[in-house]
């Protein structure tokens, strides 16, 4: 998402007029220049999607709220000692360029065409990386999914449904305060009802999300991307399973407010998953304080020659191999998934003919000779389903926990909004 934003003409680097504070956020501030820049980004992104661009006044409060929550997370990162090294940052920039089909020089040129300096882009990426790590520490690492939860999910009607249904969704969230009273709930209900009526009368969903939603994805038009049925609350999944594409739900009461969903696309179907496995054995010789790298290579060469001259591979492995997990079994690693092995070993194994011993080669562990004894494709559909279920349950818990945590840090923070015309109740 960040790479797309950087290359969508979404960043405005024009010289700003005299700056001023628009929000005090605990020990930091949000400046008018930051708000103006982000509003411009959002407007440019909407324009490139072909939508009508809302006026600046309609976006400012929504964008300011996002900047406040981002600022709080960056402050947590600072207090937690989270640092992004130049090497990590360069790697992230390279990945963004690669995903956009560009070299680093082409990426720099694209940024320049969009009015953004490379240094500004690096800072934007750095902020996103810090926020990601804060969320990993504060939210993701606390989430646990047991084997029993996975089994229960796969046995449930919802679990079975999730294997065949996937939805591309958008949402509009009208929130209520954490300790909402009846007046708060009625106010939110009136607002979501008004939004729903405008949608039924033909208002653009994305525009309404940008103008009204409190969800994290509001400025993307409420786009949630593809979600498995199992990632959604059961009632949502059942509702969507029979809902036509393009339709919206009525307002739904959820713990932190009201939500309206739009079903953008639907897809489904699951296939058997086949995994390649290789039956392989090897001899590992490691360098040590008493055996140099050159001597280790020479020993591996001598063992290779002895095998080629007819000596038994398994017996030599028992006598010489320094892999404690396989030496006593004649070097036999049994059936292995190539993806579980280091790249050099995997490449040698892929190129080896069955029954033919490879010449010695080096990995991080030492010098090897190997022999492929067989190849097969195994049905790993069940393991894939279990991994998919684990991912679904973790993602569902993460989404729920993240929204709760973001609301918590916002509620606990000292925030003073100084933007003229802002909703002071939002403080």
Curated annotation (Swiss-Prot):
PpiC domain: residues covered: 164-265, 275-374
A GO MF term: peptide binding
Enzyme Commission code(s) on record: 5.2.1.8
Known catalytic reactions: [protein]-peptidylproline (omega=180) = [protein]-peptidylproline (omega=0)
Compartments (UniProt record): Periplasm
GO terms under biological process: Gram-negative-bacterium-type cell outer membrane assembly; protein folding; protein stabilization
Signal sequence region: 1-13
Keywords carried by this UniProt record: Chaperone, Isomerase, Periplasm, Repeat, Rotamase, Signal
GO cellular component: outer membrane-bounded periplasmic space
Pfam families per record: Rotamase (PF00639), Rotamase_3 (PF13616), SurA_N (PF09312)
Superkingdom, taxonomy of origin: Bacteria
Function statement: Chaperone involved in the correct folding and assembly of outer membrane proteins. Recognizes specific patterns of aromatic residues and the orientation of their side chains, which are found more frequently in integral outer membrane proteins. May act in both early periplasmic and late outer membrane-associated steps of protein maturation.
Entry comment, domain topic: The PPIase activity resides only in the second parvulin domain. The N-terminal region and the C-terminal tail are necessary and sufficient for the chaperone activity of SurA. The PPIase activity is dispensable for SurA to function as a chaperone. The N-terminal region and the C-terminal tail are also required for porin recognition.
Protein name per UniProt: Chaperone SurA
Gene from which the chain derives: surA
